[in-house]
Design a protein with these regions (language model features):
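Membrane-proximal soluble regions of multi-pass membrane proteins
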Residues: 1-21, 186-188, 194
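Membrane-interface loop-to-helix entry segments
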Residues: 24, 78-83, 191-196
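Membrane-embedded alpha-helical segments in integral membrane proteins
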Residues: 28-44, 92-95
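Juxtamembrane "helix-exit" motif on the non-cytosolic side of transmembrane helices
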Residues: 39-43, 97-102, 178-180
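Functional transmembrane core segments of multi-pass inner-membrane proteins
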Residues: 46-51, 56-165, 170, 213-221
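Interfacial loop-to-transmembrane junctions
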Residues: 172-204
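C-terminal transmembrane module of polytopic alpha-helical membrane proteins
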Residues: 187, 203-221
Length: 221
């Protein structure tokens, strides 16, 4: 980041102009890592050093992949399968190691374990019915990871939040295109990458446990 500004946004070798994308992504990633560290501090304070280290390893890996997918889908409108499947496996491991040994047969835990698949199926149905016009299958694969990372209750709310954010941004872009001729190509048929909205919703759900539908109250009955 420092060299980016020190060299005047130019490559040291070819002197070509560099995009603002690079320092912004690096700064955002660094801030994200600090936030993740802060969320895991209670483990460290309580003396659970091994649990802290394992959580940090898994979470930093998960969110590093999320950052890559955010930027990649934003620019290329595609989610690489290799990253999606790797993310899903790591998220599933994260979910499994946080299940109490005496709670495997409880409904909340069973829903959390099944969350990835349960979230993937509606995306797959939309993709299949629309022949890929409404939503990409890559978004469904990303839903696998979201379900296993956040669990059923928070994951479901995070997905709903992602759709709300996506709808709000879509409407805003349509209004901008209607008011400014430079953005006239932004129409109802314009393709907008959805993974960034899914990832933003996931981040909010990770930091602030969400339950839009009061499902946790049902579990308390």
């Amino acid at each position: 980041v420092i060299s980016f500004f020190a060299l005047g946004r130019r490559c040291r070798g070819c002197k070509g102009k560099l995009s603002w994308q690079y320092p912004l992504v690096e700064i955002a990633t660094a801030l994200l890592f600090v936030v993740i560290f802060y969320t895991q501090m209670p483990l460290l304070v309580s003396g659970s050093v091994s649990a802290f280290m394992l959580n940090m390893l898994l979470l930093l890996t998960i969110w590093s992949i999320f950052v890559v997918l955010f930027v990649y889908d934003l620019y290329h409108k595609i989610i690489p399968d290799g990253l999606s499947y790797s993310l899903a496996v790591i998220a599933l491991i994260y979910r499994l190691i946080h299940i109490p040994y005496d709670a495997w047969n409880t409904l909340p835990v069973l829903l959390d374990i099944s969350a990835g698949v349960l979230f993937f199926l509606p995306f797959y149905a939309l993709w299949k019915i629309s022949d890929g016009r409404w939503i990409g299958l890559g978004d469904g694969k990303l839903a696998l990871s979201i379900g296993w990372l956040l669990g059923f209750v928070t994951g479901l709310s995070a997905l709903v939040l992602a759709f709300w954010i996506g709808a709000a941004v879509g409407i805003a872009l349509l209004l901008i295109s209607a008011l400014n001729k430079r953005f006239a190509r932004l129409t109802m048929k314009a393709e907008i990458p959805f993974a960034p909205f899914l990832i933003v919703g996931t981040l909010i759900g990770f930091l602030v446990p969400l339950d839009f539908f009061g499902i946790n109250l049902f579990f308390l009955l």
